[in-house]
Amino acid sequence: MEKRRGPPPCQSGSGCSNPAKIRKAKDGAQLCGPCFSRNFEDDVHEAIVNNKLFKRGERVAIGASGGKDSTVLAYVMKTLNDRHDYGLDLQLLSIDEGIKGYRDDSLLAVEKNRVEYGLPLTILSYRDLYGWTMDDIVAKIGKKNNCTFCGVFRRQALDRGAFKIGATKLVTGHNADDMAETLLMNVLRGDIARLERCTNIVTGEEGDLPRAKPLKYCFERDIVMYARTNQLEYFYTECIYAPNAYRGYARKYVRDLEKVHPRAILDLIRSGEKVSVKKEVEMPTLKICERCGYMTSQKLCKACLLIEGLNTGNTDLGVRKSKKSKKVTVEADELNKEGGCGSGGGGGGCGCAGAEDAAENEETRQRLKDLQF
């Protein structure tokens, strides 16, 4: 009888003789637990250094939702900050949308992270910022367009929270899977402005608060494995109001594509990095919202329009898009968003916002003609 083979040795290249127990999704390397963790951390450190994401002395807000991405992001940022002496002042920033049975539970996980990591935590709520909770909004308008409201409000809330604590940069838990899905969604929507920049590791440089994505090249499966290997506690439940979010369809497509072509995720990201837009595509001029002071290309920002609609009962205000002119233009709130609510990893990328606003086939084809790959 043939003897059963044990696991292969660790392939870290560091001389480790431990048996390999983890296959890294990103490159297929077979590693032991400790070497996998170190390899994962080295990948993030390389992305930070190569892209010069931070400067010594910066106060960095970490978007924290309590989910796996933001939990791993906070842990790795603290680990690398200590190990490599980045000299960063790290602080956790959470947004309470007011969703009972979901956000209140996830914030308990964030509180545990605060205690364990020893990082300051600031929580801002939709109720305090906008006078509405998501439970209130869904009760008024139903679930059809609720992701649009949440996406706009959450992104602005993160910016306001970061400014409140004096942060010079906001980091979010977008991972490689998120980036590939967002790229695909923007192609399907024909969203030229976002398509050109949705895979950037730093966005928002044209405004006051840049956003960085240190986990950009980390696969979701590796993030889950890292959390388990390091026994990190995080919140598992998905948002109860977004069971049919647009991103879900893109995610399934990317997963199916990955089964056939394992490098599909990285290839999609690399393709996005090479996208450029023709000069004749008109981009908006950013200015300040007359009501709240947030960036917009209109007199009022999208958040203020949505709030006005809720307060006056005209809930289509700010939700329905007007007919496009022949010249392709993009509203500033669309330019600023990176693919939804920015909740991916507690700060970026759910992509549910605007699911019902996907472009008609003919308009999509016309817009894609303006792209250069």
From Swiss-Prot:
Pfam family, one: ATP_bind_3
Cell compartments where the protein resides: Cytoplasm
Key word Endoplasmic reticulum present: no
EC supergroup of this enzyme: transferase
Phenotype on disruption: Required for normal germline maturation and for viability. Viable at 20 degrees Celsius. At a higher temperature (25 degrees Celsius), the hatched eggs progress through the L1-L4 larval stages with kinetics similar to those of wild type but present an important delay in germline maturation. Whereas gravid wild-type worms are present 53 hours after hatching, germline maturation are still ongoing in the mutant after 66 hours, and the first adults containing eggs are observed 75 hours after hatching, when a large number of new L1 are already present in the wild type.
GO cellular component terms given for this protein: cytosol; cytosolic tRNA wobble base thiouridylase complex
Protein family: Belongs to the TtcA family. CTU1/NCS6/ATPBD3 subfamily.
Name of the featured protein: Cytoplasmic tRNA 2-thiolation protein 1
